[in-house]
Amino acid sequence: MSFVLILSLVFGGCCSNVISFEHMVQGSNINLGNIVTFTQFVSVTLIQLPNALDFSHFPFRLRPRHIPLKIHMLAVFLFFTSSVANNSVFKFDISVPIHIIIRCSGTTLTMIIGWAVCNKRYSKLQVQSAIIMTLGAIVASLYRDKEFSMDSLKLNTDSVGMTQKSMFGIFVVLVATALMSLLSLLNEWTYNKCGKHWKETLFYSHFLALPLFMLGYTRLRDEFRDLLISSDSMDIPIVKLPIATKLFMLIANNVTQFICIKGVNMLASNTDALTLSVVLLVRKFVSLLLSVYIYKNVLSVTAYLGTITVFLGAGLYSYGSVKTALPR
């Protein structure tokens, strides 16, 4: 498959996924994060099910696993917890642009966890770029809608446009990002030990997590009901059948989520890690700009400078990653 088509899946799927999600939460007083996460897990499970089943016998059964079940279960815990946290942060007054910016600190967290847990060593350029990204993320978060001033350096969070609610939201994003960093390191170890069976990992990470959603069945039911009654209706394109707008965007979000995941995995299998990192970085930048432009999200000049700093640091890290992390 051509590189252009793969890039189209990555940019089209991932950017559209961000836009469809923001369209659902924009101007809404209800939290839809759990129902979005649940439907995404169901969709990916169903789409990946044919790859996981052995059709040579009846009744059909799951194919033999290449990776131990306990490894899948640990990955499920990290992935599920991180996904639920990421999709729930918007009820804490965190906008999509700020969400994207903070998640860029994942490189720094991965580096710290890799050094502390996996005994990895990193080049000076990688460490410097990680510090640059972290500083940029902090600046963009603290001064999201107010400009920097000397008075704002005092510890009164209100002076920089922060509240206890939004600060807790930032904490949730950071925890979710740290869990994803742990998951990345776990997957790296798993692929090195058991082989690069990413399709198996993708299926089990979603399939095994489905029972966990039953712990919040009441919340899922209420969110789905609110999704239907709190939304205007629209006509489905082509067939012209009426449907709740937010429900339509939920379906679109699930479709674009699969396209995004497929494009990223295809890109990972057709190029090197540096190119993948650069492409995903540019994709995040495009998502950020689209969110600000389409939904008129406000970012101060200081926040823009912080954003530029984040992506500058990420670019330097991508360049420095040509020399991979060395074991101690």
Swiss-Prot record:
<keyword id="KW-0333">Golgi apparatus</keyword>
<feature type="transmembrane region" description="Helical">
    <location>
        <begin position="166"/>
        <end position="186"/>
    </location>
</feature>
<dbReference type="GO" id="GO:0005789">
    <property type="term" value="C:endoplasmic reticulum membrane"/>
</dbReference>
<feature type="transmembrane region" description="Helical">
    <location>
        <begin position="122"/>
        <end position="142"/>
    </location>
</feature>
<keyword id="KW-0762">Sugar transport</keyword>
<feature type="transmembrane region" description="Helical">
    <location>
        <begin position="30"/>
        <end position="50"/>
    </location>
</feature>
<dbReference type="GO" id="GO:0005464">
    <property type="term" value="F:UDP-xylose transmembrane transporter activity"/>
</dbReference>
<keyword id="KW-0812">Transmembrane</keyword>
<feature type="transmembrane region" description="Helical">
    <location>
        <begin position="198"/>
        <end position="218"/>
    </location>
</feature>
<feature type="transmembrane region" description="Helical">
    <location>
        <begin position="66"/>
        <end position="86"/>
    </location>
</feature>
<keyword id="KW-0813">Transport</keyword>
<dbReference type="InterPro" id="IPR013657">
    <property type="entry name" value="SCL35B1-4/HUT1"/>
</dbReference>
<dbReference type="GO" id="GO:0000139">
    <property type="term" value="C:Golgi membrane"/>
</dbReference>
<dbReference type="GO" id="GO:0005462">
    <property type="term" value="F:UDP-N-acetylglucosamine transmembrane transporter activity"/>
</dbReference>
<feature type="transmembrane region" description="Helical">
    <location>
        <begin position="298"/>
        <end position="318"/>
    </location>
</feature>
<comment type="similarity">
    <text>Belongs to the nucleotide-sugar transporter family. SLC35A subfamily.</text>
</comment>
<feature type="transmembrane region" description="Helical">
    <location>
        <begin position="98"/>
        <end position="118"/>
    </location>
</feature>
<protein>
    <recommendedName>
        <fullName>UDP-N-acetylglucosamine transporter YEA4</fullName>
    </recommendedName>
</protein>
<feature type="transmembrane region" description="Helical">
    <location>
        <begin position="274"/>
        <end position="294"/>
    </location>
</feature>
<keyword id="KW-0472">Membrane</keyword>
<keyword id="KW-1133">Transmembrane helix</keyword>
<feature type="transmembrane region" description="Helical">
    <location>
        <begin position="241"/>
        <end position="261"/>
    </location>
</feature>
<comment type="function">
    <text>Sugar transporter that specifically mediates the transport of UDP-N-acetylglucosamine (UDP-GlcNAc) from the cytosol into Golgi vesicles where glycosyltransferases function.</text>
</comment>
<feature type="transmembrane region" description="Helical">
    <location>
        <begin position="1"/>
        <end position="21"/>
    </location>
</feature>
<dbReference type="Pfam" id="PF08449">
    <property type="entry name" value="UAA"/>
</dbReference>
